[in-house]
Amino acid sequence: MSVFGRMAGVALLGFGLVVAGSAMAGDAVKGEKVFKKCKACHYVDKEKNKTGPHLVAVLGREAGSLEGYKYSKAMKASGLVWDEETLAAYLKAPKKYVKGTKMAFAGLKKDKDVADVIAYLKAAN
């Protein structure tokens, strides 16, 4: 293969990686719409608990650590810190990710919805 052919291949590979990466980048506006499912139990804009804990500044927070909310023993003992990766896994299947969690929601089925909700949580805080 010629040098030009290899350079073109590398350029196409790089372009493909950029496109794939941006496909999973979340959209905060769409995430706000998806978050409507969560609003029944969680606030994102005020430090007040509902059925679930508030999600103000949730990224970087140790799971089960918010004062004033009664977490499950499983959540308190999980040792998780909420970052994009742990939050994504939890939002997809809460009861599988933290067995014994009190969260009744079954999870978000679409990876794009998960990414959008995380983008919304980041933008809201």
List the predicted regions and their residue ranges:
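Bacterial N-terminal signal peptides that target proteins for export
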Residues: 1-11
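Juxtamembrane/interfacial segments around transmembrane helices
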Residues: 1, 84-86
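Bacterial N-terminal signal peptides
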Residues: 9-19
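A general structural signal for short secondary-structure boundary/capping elements
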Residues: 85, 100-106, 119
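Sec/Tat signal peptide C-region and signal peptidase I cleavage site
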Residues: 19-27
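Short, exposed beta-strand-loop hairpins at the edges of beta-sheets
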Residues: 106-125
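Periplasmic/extracellular electron-transfer cofactor-ligation site
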Residues: 26-81, 88-101, 123-125
